[in-house]
Amino acid sequence: MTFLSPPEIPTIKADNGTYYDFNNGARILFPKGEWHVNIIDEESGNILFSCDTKAGWVTSTKKYYVKFRIQAFKKGDEKPFLDTVMELKDKPVLISFPTGTLGDIIAWFHYAEKFRIKHQCKLECSVSEEFITLLSDNYPDIKFTSAQDKYEGKPYATYRIGLFFNGDTDNQPVDFRLVGFHRNAGYILGVSPQEDPPRLNLSAERKIQEPYVCIAVQSTAQAKHWNNGLGWAEVVRYLKELGYRVLCIDRNAHAGNGFVWNHIPWGAEDFTGALPLQERVDLLRHASFFVGLSSGLSWLAWASRIPVVLISGFSRPDSEFYTPWRVFNSHGCNGCWDNTNYNFDHTDFLWCPVHKGTDRQFECTRLITGKQVCGVIRTLHSYLTNHDRII
């Protein structure tokens, strides 16, 4: 994941030619001389770092939200010439999000709004252009900046929201695999990890009169797919028997890597394409429900406030947003994404850390049968029927 870089020089000038700020942790830049510095967690009083130094940088190891206190002394002095506690109220703060992901940003963004409300700061968020289009009108108190542009701002503090692997607890206070990847944003920012969908424009008029269900069958790794060879065909057939049109809304009708490719299910209507996210929301908003994977379009459906049938074994049931229509099979190997013994390999499309190359590869979703998913759909359909919510 790539993020905006902090300013080359800290943004606040102190006495004695010293500069400091809180961009990607506490940062202090000293001129020539003999100095002593303390970096303190103000909430606990713990001294996180204390050292003598000459000209150069002192930076905190921890980059997530900590209420830092910085004390800087001329070496030998008892009284600091700089003694400041980080205070974000009315200060310019940047939250930098990575690009190239859909579900991650949908999952994380409302934590930024919680942060703004908590601290009453002047918040700026760096996201890709497609998310500026999707979100900016619904968050008028946040300034949006394109992550693709060169950044020349001078914020007081910067935070980076992402997934940090290999047990990294410098950029996140806890390993994201222990708390669910979306809640990780709450922990990084020091706000409640309770999940909340972002605010979207849900005002589009309905264009398809018949009841319909949206599905999405593609994802970024084969482990995230539903690897039951007959599953999607059974689900599409069953949905049509219930009277729904079935619209496949993946970006691509066919996607894969090397010798493994996944295709739009037989019988589904092809609504695939690289469409603006708002157009996807406009279609999802009026669907009776969505059936998908541990992938970005499931998150977009959740944010569109419709029921989501989520099929996954690669991740554990609390790894994504809560849905009563989660489909998970505990009878085989499962949950490798959330297992701290394994580090996900983004370069290996066929990553399966325990059973790759054996007949048990991807059994986490292969053992989820069409019967099991159709059973969940039957329960959801009955609920919608009984509450007069078939739309």
Swiss-Prot record:
Reactions that this protein is recorded to catalyse: ADP-D-glycero-beta-D-manno-heptose + L-seryl-[protein] = O-(D-glycero-alpha-D-manno-heptosyl)-L-seryl-[protein] + ADP + H(+); ADP-L-glycero-beta-D-manno-heptose + L-seryl-[protein] = O-(L-glycero-alpha-D-manno-heptosyl)-L-seryl-[protein] + ADP + H(+)
Biological process annotations from GO: lipopolysaccharide core region biosynthetic process
Record bears the keyword Hydrolase: no
Disrupted-gene phenotype: Loss of bacteria adhesion to human HeLa cells. Reduces glycosylation of AIDA-I.
Active site: 104
Keyword Acetylation: no
InterPro entries attached to this UniProt entry: Aah/TibC-like, Glyco_trans_9, LPS_LOS_Heptosyltrfase, TibC/BAHTCr-like_N
Subcellular location: Cytoplasm
Keyword field: Cytoplasm, Glycosyltransferase, Iron, Metal-binding, Plasmid, Transferase
Phenotype when changing residue 294 to P: Loss of the ability to use ADP- L, D-heptose as a sugar donor
Binding residues annotated for Fe(3+), in chain numbering: 333, 336, 352, 364
Cofactor(s) demanded: Fe(3+)
A Pfam family: Glyco_transf_9
Major subcellular site: cytoplasm
Function text: Glycosylates autotransporter AIDA-I. Catalyzes the addition of both L, D-heptose and D, D-heptose sugars. Probably by glycosylating AIDA-I, involved in bacteria adhesion to host mammalian cells.
Family to which this protein belongs: Belongs to the glycosyltransferase 9 family.
Protein name: Autotransporter heptosyltransferase Aah
Species for this entry: Escherichia coli
